[in-house]
Design a protein with these regions (language model features):
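Transport-system extracytoplasmic interface segments
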Residues: 1-83
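Short amphipathic alpha-helical interaction/hinge segments
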Residues: 27, 31, 80, 96, ...
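Membrane-spanning alpha-helical segments of multipass transporters and channels
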Residues: 121, 129-133, 141-268
Length: 268
């Protein structure tokens, strides 16, 4: 079976095992029929206990219910990371950093917030609209209200932008940081736990998954969509998303120094 993609491999393996289970019963059925046993007797012998499954919030076991919402935001976080670092990096690339800081009266926090706020509003509108399409138009079932999903999406957008600011502060050269955030976005998609359970990964990889905002977002959303068990089960993830903002704030002085030094403007 194909395990290059775990989700596809799991489906193929499940279908293969179901087929083999049916084929393995064929000789027994033929022999029992030859002995004169009726269909009900054969069924009772082969399946003495019938299982009855009732999946919560997805009785049809529709894969789109499980994957549509997280997959959208997994890919969306890559766009947020790339747009955010380019928006800030363009000031260094086109050597307008001094004018940018002067417009903010040399306040790096004001400069970053003023630069990113329009993008934040656009990303938040896109997130709310995506939730409306998935849960209002496509009628994907969910256990919570509509606004908790939107507030979680908005927090995710801001936390992802904060991660982008943090990474750009570490690598304040747009030619370098574009590659870095692309790698971070890809790793976040891999380690978010959508296609493979994080708990089953190697311990170092498991703990590394919590370095990505999308992992915390997926855990919060799973809580909201499949039970809405309350804030006590997600407060760690919510706190972690706020922690990304603190990381970005901590490196703003370094970013300001990098802009004023002009030494990253010639890196292509």
């Amino acid at each position: 079976y194909h395990y290059a993609l775990l989700s596809v491999g799991g489906e193929v393996r499940g279908a293969f095992e179901t087929l083999l289970r049916t084929l393995s019963l064929a000789p027994v059925v033929v022999q029992a029929t030859a002995m004169g046993l009726g269909e009900n007797q054969i069924t009772t012998f082969l399946l003495p206990v019938r299982s009855s499954s009732h999946p919560l919030f997805n009785p049809d076991l529709d894969y789109s219910v499980y994957l549509s919402n997280p997959f959208f935001f997994v890919f969306f976080q890559v766009i947020i990371l790339l747009v955010t670092v380019y928006a800030i990096g363009s000031e260094i690339k086109f050597r307008t950093g001094d004018e940018w800081l002067e417009a903010a009266r040399m306040n790096m926090f004001v400069a970053v917030v003023g630069k990113l706020l329009p993008y934040t509003i656009i990303f938040c509108i896109m997130s709310v609209f995506a939730n409306y399409i998935m849960f209002g138009v496509m009628h994907i079932p969910f256990a919570c209200g509509f606004w908790p999903l939107n507030l979680t999406a908005i927090l995710f957008v801001v936390a992802t932008q904060a991660l982008a600011v943090f990474l750009f502060s570490l690598f304040p050269a747009i030619a370098i940081v574009i590659s870095v955030v692309s790698m971070v976005g890809s790793l976040g998609a891999t380690l978010c736990g959508v296609t493979f359970p994080v708990d089953s990964m190697y311990a170092p990889v498991h703990f590394a998954s919590y370095l990505f905002p999308v992992r915390h977002f997926v855990e919060i959303n799973q809580n909201l969509l499949y039970g809405d068990y309350g804030f006590p089960y997600t407060w760690v993830n919510v706190s972690s998303l706020f922690a990304f903002m603190l990381l970005a704030l901590a490196l703003l002085p370094h970013l300001k120094t990098a802009i004023l030094s002009h030494k990253y403007e010639n890196i292509r």
